């Protein structure tokens, strides 16, 4: 754990970390930055409340309290308040060290009782009272420190007033002699005798007359006389409150009714007291209503008084917003809105706190709250820079709650529709929006596409700004169809609208409610956006991201089982013949039928409405893996549940019968609500009424009566009623959550022969539960003979099998049925290939869906099946090559399971040999050539080489289209960073070059640039030993398999830290040079205490590098000074972090540009930066960037940069001599060929030549120069060396 904030990202179901507070926690507290300290204390208070044993695990307790003691003395009251609040929250966790720790900070804590800030005073006496409540025996220590402070106190009356709060019930029987002696000393109470008398009188009533007389008898006569004088004229009322506790009221000097104290400069203290009353909602509502009147009538003078107290004012509202009372929340949000409306630009300094305040109720489904939040942000966008507000909102797009993400997107959309687009930077908005298209929730994707329409309209035809990030994201995620979906939405030319209440009304009806398009229409290109919103590009959501609902939440378990039995009896009565399939258009008009084929009447349908209603309620309870599979297989399985449920299949009916049906049957949508009109007449529904129409909970669509209607069984419940008589294994109670506990414990390579998932049997013949392994106790169940378990289709009569039957089994929830279906497809492809070929599209889609199955035993069988089908169908598989290659290549790069990689590679080998060479080559290239996974690219390069060798060189070279597709890919492979990708690419080019007509055909069918690039690659191969050297290198590099199955996961930064980084980047890119200077200062501070976080943000580094070349001289100088000061903490990261290596070129070019500056200061700073860079960063990492900068340098820049490049080459040659030769020698040839006439450039070229001659050797250097330089230039080089 690298920072304090990482602890807050831990989910509730994880075990607490043994080192809960990180090592850099103390460094954060010692930081000079105000925001860093404040944020650290806020997070620490949260941790202290949540984890009881954090203090015992923390090692440096003494140093921690030294930091706290120092922060309490800080001049800024916000830090004082938060630090003392941390003590209040953490004090119960100190245990036996409470007295020692609190007495350590008490001398600096007591003076805060007389602070000029009411907030600090309140939290201080709360901390002291908490301490004394936990440790009553520590009262004497506290009173002695109080006595030491009294003589030096300048506000004794305020101090005495605050001491009333320590009269708590736990201290009734304690010894108060020290306090009485202190207050009977004349020097201590001079000028505040009345307040001291009131306190003494209250103490008298508090401890009782018996203890009071004991204290008085021990006083000296002088002090006894002083005590009688100060208490002589004081009267204290002793009344009983409702709770039964004693309440003392002093009547010495009552305040006049006209006097009142104002909190925050504008709010009467009486109103604040009503608001603070959290036990009585009516009083709090009354106080909020009065406060609302004050805020609505605020004057400019009152605004000036409120602004200095704005932090504590918003803190008070934040506490109120945590109330559970609806009216309280609405009034508080309305006050927040009014505050932002009246303060306008004054709110910018507290914008992050303001946004976090309102964000407490993001995702709330109450219409009033959503309206107030929308109004608040619309006014905020108008009064403050929209870019600042948008940056604060961005962090909530990563919230786990999908309703929060949807609401934030709608706020962005509304702001774009109401604010001038010139105030926004649309490109970053597009970059933020694009990942939302791939969100796991339909509602979020729908909201994102609505915002897309608005952005496309504002860009006024410049769609490339949108399409480029979409294509990049699609490539990064290896998802297909997003570009088409975005294009379809842009072509619709429809926009959402803002309703009368300020909320967004979508331009298209949400697919979760009703969708009047048939499935055939969904596949049209014009509806690609709707299809994407429904299916998310066919990507199955992770079932472990959803919380498993316990069976008890589903309702009456007895009712569920009774409905299940009725359903099984109904299914048993059905005839066992298969009905022909019909198109979706006809199926939507078919009538319901009873099991015996008789048509249901309208009355019968109405009588079953109660059962339908029960099923609607039960759909929320379905198991998560069936829900996931239902979404993923929507387009593939005609008999499975989809987002648009089809009617049951039946034979064609006559037109007269259709008319009679339509006259009696009401058309209902997916939620069984009677439709009132078609899609054109339907009012689009907003994000608000989307949930209001459904009641408090959102329901899933009700599928047909099929396998999805089976209620989820409780974990550990097993039944044999769901299976055929020949099948013995029990059903799974719960899906296995890890591939380590699968039934296949040994992982033999799967062959194309039929495979059945093995069942492990214990000694007594009972079965172990699937997914539990040997750790599960055996359960005695009735079972049949073992011979019935091993069912192989090779021994069955294949005439009884059909593709539809196999697809139905594959759509089952049970993994064993899925494997049976896959094995049936494999057998049918061997025995009846014509049947499989006629239904090839449906078969391939179903198998590919199972390739993505989370259970590896199913996915492996599916991967092997796809290879078997391809092997048996040969060229008939060509039409599905692209889909198959995309899935299998992604599986060949799977880092979690080496056996899946091997199976995918075997199936691809069969696919490549079976399909047409041209189609196979095209599919392989499209699926893997541009992947970012090294293993996938390596697999792709090897298969391309295999296909080229199968097809032959002449077939490629003579076909201009084929050559134009293959040649750029092979050049890309030959330049790849991974040797496993480079070597097959070079081998392919070498194979083509062996053709006798290679040169002629290349000149005829290839471009000149490609011919030159190919020659360079072939020359490099020959220089390194030819094709044989490539094969030996490939053998040394290893195969595609990886050692281990783990992947390094990039940890997500905490939201608060990421927000700081975003703010710094915004300031670095600001239009005003003063803000850019501020951004540089904050960047330097952030590098000092969170360098790894800075290094992880590539955009922040790029923004900093852009300041190195700033047009403003002050900013550029400050940036270079900042670069030098941060080099100590960032140097190692520049050498190791891949994202920083990617920006090294920009850094080198930015520094080199100042070498030709007219300003001597800039030139000196640039030289210093370059020298520090070469000394600090690892030479091999820096060498490519410096080579590029040296090549592009001009005449003025070249002498210095070339000299420094020589020093870098000396350092890098020790570890990477070949790399230095490859990079430095072309630079030397270029310098000799194009040498400048001035003396400095000649000296620099001579220094480079001598350096390389010393490193490589003079003779070898001249030999290498023979093929690069003409004789005259070679003589010049010889003269330079000598």
From Swiss-Prot:
Disruption phenotype: Impaired structure and function of sensory cilia on amphid neurons. Strongly reduced length of the sensory cilium on the ASER neuron. Contrary to wild-type cilia that display the canonical ring of nine doublet microtubule bundles surrounding central singlet microtubules in the proximal and middle part, cilia from mutant nematodes have poorly defined microtubule organization at the cilium proximal end, and no visible microtubules at their distal ends.
Compartment annotation: Cell projection, Cilium; Perikaryon; Cell projection, Dendrite
Sequence segments annotated as region (TOG 2): 268-515
UniProtKB keywords: Cell projection, Chemotaxis, Cilium biogenesis/degradation, Repeat
Chief site of localization: other
Family the entry assigns: Belongs to the Crescerin family.
Record comment regarding domains: The TOG regions are composed of HEAT-type repeats that assemble into a solenoid structure. They mediate interaction with microtubules.
The name this protein goes by in its record: Crescerin-like protein che-12
Organism: Caenorhabditis elegans
Gene that encodes it: che-12
């Amino acid at each position: 754990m690298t920072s304090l904030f990482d602890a807050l990202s831990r989910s509730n179901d994880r075990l607490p970390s043994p080192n809960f507070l990180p090592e850099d926690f103390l460094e954060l507290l010692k930081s000079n930055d105000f925001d860093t300290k404040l944020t650290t204390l806020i997070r620490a208070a949260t941790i202290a409340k949540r984890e009881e044993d954090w203090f015992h695990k923390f090692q440096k307790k003494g140093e921690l309290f030294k930091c706290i003691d120092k922060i309490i003395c800080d001049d800024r009251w916000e830090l004082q308040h938060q630090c003392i609040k941390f003590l209040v929250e953490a004090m119960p966790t100190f245990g036996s060290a409470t007295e020692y720790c609190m007495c350590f900070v008490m001398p600096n804590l007591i003076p805060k009782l007389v602070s000029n800030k009411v907030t600090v005073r309140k939290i201080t006496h709360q901390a002291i009272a908490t301490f004394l409540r936990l440790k009553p025996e520590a009262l004497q220590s506290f009173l002695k420190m109080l006595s030491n402070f009294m003589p030096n106190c300048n506000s004794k009356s305020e101090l005495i007033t605050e001491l009333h709060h320590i009269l708590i019930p736990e201290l009734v029987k304690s010894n108060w002699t020290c306090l009485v002696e202190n207050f009977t000393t004349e020097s201590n109470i001079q000028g505040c005798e009345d307040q001291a008398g009131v306190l003494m009188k209250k103490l008298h009533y508090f401890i009782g007359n018996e203890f009071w007389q004991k204290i008085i008898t021990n006083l000296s006569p002088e002090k006894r006389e002083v005590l009688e004088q100060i208490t002589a004229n004081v009267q204290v009322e002793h009344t009983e409150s409702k709770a039964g506790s004693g309440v003392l009221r002093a009547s010495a000097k009552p305040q006049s009714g006209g006097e009142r104290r104002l909190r925050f400069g504008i709010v009467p203290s009486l109103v604040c007291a009503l608001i603070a009353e959290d036990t009585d909602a009516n009083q709090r509502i009354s106080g909020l209503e009065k406060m609302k009147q004050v805020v609505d009538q605020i004057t400019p003078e009152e605004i000036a008084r409120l602004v200095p107290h704005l932090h504590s004012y918003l803190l008070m509202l934040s506490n109120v917003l945590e109330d559970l009372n609806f009216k309280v929340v609405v009034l508080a949000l309305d006050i927040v809105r009014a505050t932002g409306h009246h303060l306008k630009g004054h709110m910018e300094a507290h914008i992050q706190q303001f946004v976090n305040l309102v964000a407490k109720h993001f995702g709330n489904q109450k219409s009033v709250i959503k309206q107030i939040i929308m109004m608040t942000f619309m006014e905020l966008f108008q009064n403050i820079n929209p870019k600042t507000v948008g940056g604060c909102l961005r962090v909530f797009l990563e919230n786990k709650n999908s309703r929060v993400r949807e609401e934030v997107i709608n706020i962005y959309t509304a702001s774009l529709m109401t604010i001038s687009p010139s105030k926004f930077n649309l490109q970053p908005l597009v970059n933020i929006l694009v990942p939302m298209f791939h969100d796991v929730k339909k509602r979020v994707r729908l909201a994102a596409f609505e915002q897309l329409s608005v952005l496309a309209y504002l860009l006024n035809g410049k769609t490339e700004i949108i399409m480029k990030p979409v294509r990049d994201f699609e490539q990064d995620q290896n998802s297909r169809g997003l570009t088409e979906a975005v294009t379809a939405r842009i072509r619709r030319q429809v926009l959402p609208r803002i309703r009368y209440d300020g909320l967004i009304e979508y331009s298209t009806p949400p697919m979760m409610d009703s969708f009047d398009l048939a499935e055939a229409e969904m596949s049209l290109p014009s509806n690609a956006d709707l299809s994407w919103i429904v299916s998310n590009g066919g990507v199955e959501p992770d079932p472990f991201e959803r919380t498993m609902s316990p069976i008890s939440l589903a309702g009456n378990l007895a009712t569920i089982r009774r409905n299940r039995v009725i359903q099984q009896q109904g299914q048993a009565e059905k005839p066992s013949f298969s009905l022909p399939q019909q198109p979706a258009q006809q199926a939507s008009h078919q009538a319901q039928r009873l099991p015996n084929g008789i048509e249901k009447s309208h009355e019968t349908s109405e009588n079953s409405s109660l059962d339908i209603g029960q099923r609607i309620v039960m759909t929320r309870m379905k198991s998560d893996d069936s829900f996931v599979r239902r979404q993923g297989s929507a387009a593939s399985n005609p008999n499975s549940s989809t987002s648009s449920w089809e009617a049951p299949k039946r034979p064609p009916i006559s037109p007269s019968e259709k008319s009679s049906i339509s006259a009696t049957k009401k058309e209902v949508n997916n939620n069984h609500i009677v439709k009132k009109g078609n899609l054109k007449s339907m009012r689009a529904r907003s994000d608000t009424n989307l949930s209001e129409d459904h009641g408090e909970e959102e329901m899933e669509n009700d599928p047909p009566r099929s396998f999805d209607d089976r209620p989820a069984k409780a974990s550990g419940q097993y039944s044999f009623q769901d299976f055929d008589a020949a099948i013995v294994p029990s059903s799974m109670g719960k899906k296995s959550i890890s591939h380590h506990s699968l039934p296949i414990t040994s992982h033999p390579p799967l062959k194309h022969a039929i495979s059945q998932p093995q069942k492990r049997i214990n000694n007594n013949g009972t079965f172990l539960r699937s997914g539990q392994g040997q750790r599960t106790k055996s359960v005695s169940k009735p079972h049949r003979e073992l011979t019935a378990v091993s069912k192989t289709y090779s021994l069955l009569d294949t005439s009884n099998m059909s593709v539809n039957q196999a697809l139905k089994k594959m759509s089952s929830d049970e993994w064993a049925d899925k494997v049976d279906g896959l094995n049936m497809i494999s057998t049918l492809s061997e025995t009846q290939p014509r049947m499989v070929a006629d239904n090839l599209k449906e078969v391939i889609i179903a198998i590919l869906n199972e390739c993505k199955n989370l259970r590896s035993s199913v996915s492996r069988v599916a991967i092997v099946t796809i290879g078997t089908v391809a092997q048996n169908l040969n060229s008939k598989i060509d039409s599905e090559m692209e889909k198959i290659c995309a899935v299998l290549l992604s599986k060949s790069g799977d880092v979690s399971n080496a056996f899946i990689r091997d199976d995918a590679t075997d199936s691809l080998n069969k696919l490549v040999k079976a399909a047409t060479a041209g189609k196979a080559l095209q599919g392989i290239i499209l699926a893997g050539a541009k992947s970012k996974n090294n293993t996938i690219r390596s697999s792709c390069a090897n298969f391309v080489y295999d296909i080229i060798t199968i097809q032959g060189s002449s077939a490629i070279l003579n076909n201009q289209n084929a050559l134009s597709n293959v040649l750029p890919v092979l050049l890309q492979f030959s330049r790849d960073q991974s040797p496993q990708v480079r070597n097959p690419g070079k081998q392919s080019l070498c194979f083509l070059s062996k053709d006798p007509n290679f040169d002629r055909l290349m000149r005829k069918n290839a471009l000149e640039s490609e011919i030159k690039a190919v020659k360079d690659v072939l020359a490099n191969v020959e220089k390194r030993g030819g094709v044989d050297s490539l094969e030996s290198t490939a053998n040394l590099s290893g195969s595609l398999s990886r050692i281990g199955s783990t992947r390094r996961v990039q940890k997500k930064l905490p939201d608060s830290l990421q927000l700081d980084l975003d703010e710094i980047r915004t300031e670095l890119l600001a239009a005003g040079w003063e803000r850019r200077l501020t951004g540089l200062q904050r960047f330097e501070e952030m590098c000092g205490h969170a360098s790894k976080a800075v290094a992880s943000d590539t955009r922040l580094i790029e923004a900093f590098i852009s300041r190195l070349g700033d047009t403003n001289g002050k900013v550029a100088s400050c940036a270079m000074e900042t670069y030098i000061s941060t080099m100590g903490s960032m140097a190692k990261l520049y050498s190791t972090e891949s994202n920083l290596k990617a920006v090294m070129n920009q850094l080198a070019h930015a520094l080199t540009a100042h070498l030709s500056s007219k300003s001597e200061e800039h030139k000196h700073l640039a030289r210093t930066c370059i020298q520090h860079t070469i000394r600090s960063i690892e030479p091999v990492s820096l060498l490519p960037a410096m080579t590029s900068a040296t090549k592009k340098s001009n005449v003025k820049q070249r002498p210095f940069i070339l000299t420094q490049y020589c020093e870098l080459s000396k350092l890098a040659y020790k570890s990477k001599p070949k790399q230095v030769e490859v990079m430095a020698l072309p630079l030397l040839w270029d310098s000799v060929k194009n040498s400048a006439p001035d003396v400095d450039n000649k000296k620099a070229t001579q220094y480079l030549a001598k350096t390389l001659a010393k490193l490589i050797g003079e003779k070898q250097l001249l030999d290498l120069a023979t093929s690069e330089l003409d004789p005259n230039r070679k003589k010049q080089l010889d003269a330079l060396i000598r």
